[in-house]
């Protein structure tokens, strides 16, 4: 449960996934997987073909989600996952955000 982890043990990662990751269901698979794991955050496509996402939750669960990003859904071909650690903001829910222009 996302609310069962003390705030001090929560982490936030900002990831950028490179490869064939648009048009293959990456965003919606990310929402499903992150929601099943009890993470909060968001995911969106970028104009340069990458997928950007933010995950907040317990360290071990967030790290599991980052590992999932290295493979993605079956049709994806992931070349790289860049990970930046940030301060948690206390996000609620998990959503697909609109494309950045």
Curated annotation (Swiss-Prot):
Swiss-Prot/TrEMBL keywords: Hydrolase
GO function term, MF aspect, one: acylphosphatase activity
Catalyzed chemical reaction(s): an acyl phosphate + H2O = a carboxylate + phosphate + H(+)
Location of the active site: 27, 45
Bilayer-spanning residue ranges: none
Coiled-coil region: none
The protein's enzyme class: hydrolase
E.C. number(s) listed in UniProt: 3.6.1.7
Annotated ranges, domain Acylphosphatase-like: 12-98
Record family assignment: Belongs to the acylphosphatase family.
NCBIfam families, per the entry: PRK14441.1, PRK14444.1
Name the record gives this protein: Acylphosphatase
Gene designation: acyP
